[in-house]
């Protein structure tokens, strides 16, 4: 039978392992941010790219997506840009066109965002 102490130790070890994996993943994603900004600006004529959300504020986990706000991205190329970013990051991306964002989201982007 498993004791309460053993269970606590196991849960703590699993939690530490999840945090470590999340941090490794976050560092890998952060390393791709300059490339993402270059793609959006050079290939898709965006004028500004801003990181926001869990990767920007340090609350990311192993399931977090990459949240990017973009100014000047033509709506006609939005899905092409999104596909390129998902391929680059190897996972989900929330690409927000500033021109279409709700005021509450714009406020959040302004408060926590990091220009790339």
Identify the meaning behind each predicted range.
Residues 51-54:
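Glycine-rich beta-strand-to-loop/alpha-helix junction loops that act as flexible
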Residues 1-47, 57-62, 72-116:
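Catalytic core of pol beta-like nucleotidyltransferases
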